[in-house]
């Protein structure tokens, strides 16, 4: 990290600490004719003041947050610092930038059962080194990105006196632990994560069962059906402009969750996703496909000190991927597997986590995680790559399963992965959490069939060990309004990669919430 920006993390954390001393002592006096006429009942604590400000009337509530991040990484997306191996990203293998995300939201309650929800968001970024992606590629300085209506929906509780909730519009949807449904906008990098959708949640109280039926219509462009605040369109050399996701998407979800047995919560689901290429003239963007996913999840607390979660899913359907199905011969495929049309999908994924809760003074926890996502076999005309659908978010790594998959598949399109290892979590002092994780990472297939043409030299095509992954996270919540964290990740590359260099990722964050 550059010397002049290295103190930023310290400055942010110190400012947060100073900010926390104010609410504890601040009192706000209600409007009176003079200060001397104030009575004890007219003096509010900061918490009371904030509550009254955010809920000025029974028909309105509002709030906001402001997130500041300083992020640095090296080789995470280029996979190597050698331009000969990574000609596009190699020259910009080292990245440092600031992210300033602001959001404000409001809810209107026209009746007891109906709520109108609105949220606006914007995240300008300042690149301290030449930018690595999108319309700002190769530039430094402030990137004044667009603002967007991040949420806009109507929620109707107990429609027609049914034990249900109907939500229509732009909304956040997170099912299970987000493995396959958690983020509808992976291309904007945690700036937003909404899905344009209709969701009906039906509760069978006596059966301890919840049924979710969801329909999705998601566009690649952020201004497709609702204008953005500021330009999000194309610029010379970047005809795609800024994207939310890689293709236009339609989907249907049926998700049933039963919690009758605390030791064995059962989820079963069917997911359908239809992909339609956004720009037919741009091979790297998106795919055409119809993906059908059938899966289930089991989780619970079988004993006082143990908890677990296990999930598995199988996929079928068909997909046409421009990167794989390009005109002419694909260098990654043998002659018998060449195709330019749709391929039948035959893929599956598994994941699990077992945690021991010490329940001691420091709240020690020790977990063992494992995950398998099938990869595409280059020797067949089928598509064996498991698609994580709307799960392209940093589920276990802010670095590897987001940036490092860009040359291999797409942003957050984690696939062809075998991952296992432990995590230790502890709360050494009140409001502070620390965790340390190690994962051994492997590939089921040693040839990344979807690697971008300019990135193929970065892969050895002969090894299956992705590398040793290490993560350390320190979080602290100062109060209800200020929190912060320090985040670090490292990967020592294995023989899956040509150069076998080290990747690293560092972040300092402060979040202000009102």
Summary of predicted features, one role per range:
Residues 2-95, 105, 109-111, 362-366, ...:
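N-terminal periplasmic/intermembrane-space "pro-region" immediately following the signal or transit peptide
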Residues 27, 160-166, 184-380, 427, ...:
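Signature for the C-terminal beta-barrel architecture of outer-membrane proteins
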Residues 40, 72-100, 107-162, 175-186, ...:
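Surface-exposed loop and membrane-interface regions of Gram-negative outer-membrane beta-barrel proteins
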Residues 153, 422, 435, 467-477, ...:
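Conserved C-terminal beta-signal and adjacent last beta-strands/turns
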Residues 380-416:
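Flexible glycine-rich, low-complexity coil/linker segments exposed to the extracellular/periplasmic environment
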Residues 385-389, 438-444, 450-456, 490-492:
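Active/binding-pocket-proximal capping segment
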Residues 408-449, 465, 507:
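Exposed, low-structure sequence patches enriched in small/polar residues
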Residues 502-514:
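Outer-membrane beta-barrel "beta-signal"
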């Amino acid at each position: 990290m550059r010397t002049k920006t290295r103190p930023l993390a310290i400055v942010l954390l110190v400012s947060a600490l100073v900010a926390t001393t104010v609410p504890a002592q601040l009192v706000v006096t209600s409007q009176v004719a003079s200060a001397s006429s104030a009575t004890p009942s007219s003096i509010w604590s900061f918490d009371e003041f904030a509550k009254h400000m955010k809920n000025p009337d029974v028909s309105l509530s509002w709030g906001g947050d402001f997130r500041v991040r300083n992020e640095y990484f090296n080789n995470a997306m280029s996979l190597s610092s050698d331009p000969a191996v990574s000609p596009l990203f190699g020259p910009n293998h080292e990245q440092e930038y600031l992210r300033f995300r602001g959001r404000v939201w409001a809810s209107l309650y026209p009746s007891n059962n109906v709520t109108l929800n609105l949220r606006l968001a914007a995240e300008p970024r300042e690149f301290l080194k030449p930018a690595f992606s999108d319309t700002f590629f190769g530039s430094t300085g402030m990137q004044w990105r667009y603002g967007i209506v991040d949420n806009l929906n109507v929620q109707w509780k107990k429609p027609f006196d049914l034990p249900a909730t109907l939500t229509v519009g732009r909304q956040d949807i997170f099912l299970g632990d987000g493995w396959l449904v958690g983020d509808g906008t992976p291309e904007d990098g945690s700036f937003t994560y909404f899905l344009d959708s209709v969701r009906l949640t039906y509760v069978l109280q006596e059966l301890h069962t919840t049924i979710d039926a969801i329909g999705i219509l998601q566009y690649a462009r952020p201004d497709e059906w609702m204008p953005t605040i500021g330009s999000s369109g194309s610029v010379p050399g970047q005809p795609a402009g800024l994207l939310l996701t890689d293709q236009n998407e339609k989907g249907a979800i049926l998700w049933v969750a039963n919690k009758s047995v605390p030791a064995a919560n059962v989820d079963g689901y069917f997911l359908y996703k239809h992909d339609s290429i956004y720009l037919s003239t741009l091979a790297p963007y998106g795919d055409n496909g119809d993906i059908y996913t059938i899966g289930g999840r089991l989780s619970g607390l079988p004993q006082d000190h143990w908890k677990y979660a296990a999930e598995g899913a199988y996929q079928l359907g068909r997909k046409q991927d421009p990167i794989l199905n390009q005109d002419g011969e694909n260098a990654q495929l043998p002659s018998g597997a060449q195709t330019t049309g749709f391929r039948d999908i035959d893929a599956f994924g598994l994941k699990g986590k077992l945690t021991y809760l010490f329940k001691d003074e420091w709240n020690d926890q020790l977990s063992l995680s494992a995950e398998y996502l099938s990869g595409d076999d280059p020797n067949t005309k089928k598509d064996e790559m498991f698609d994580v659908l709307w799960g392209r978010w940093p589920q276990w790594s802010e670095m590897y399963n987001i940036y490092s998959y860009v040359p291999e598949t797409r942003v957050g399109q984690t696939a062809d992965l075998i991952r296992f290892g432990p995590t230790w979590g502890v709360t050494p002092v009140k409001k502070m959490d620390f965790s340390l994780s190690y994962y051994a990472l492997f590939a089921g297939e040693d040839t990344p069939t979807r690697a971008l043409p300019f990135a193929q030299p970065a892969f050895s095509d002969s090894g299956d060990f992705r590398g040793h992954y290490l993560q350390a996270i320190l979080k602290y919540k100062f109060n209800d309004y200020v929190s912060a964290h320090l985040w670090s990740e490292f990967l020592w590359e294995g023989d899956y990669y040509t150069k076998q260099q080290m990747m690293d990722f560092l972040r300092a964050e402060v979040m202000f919430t009102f």
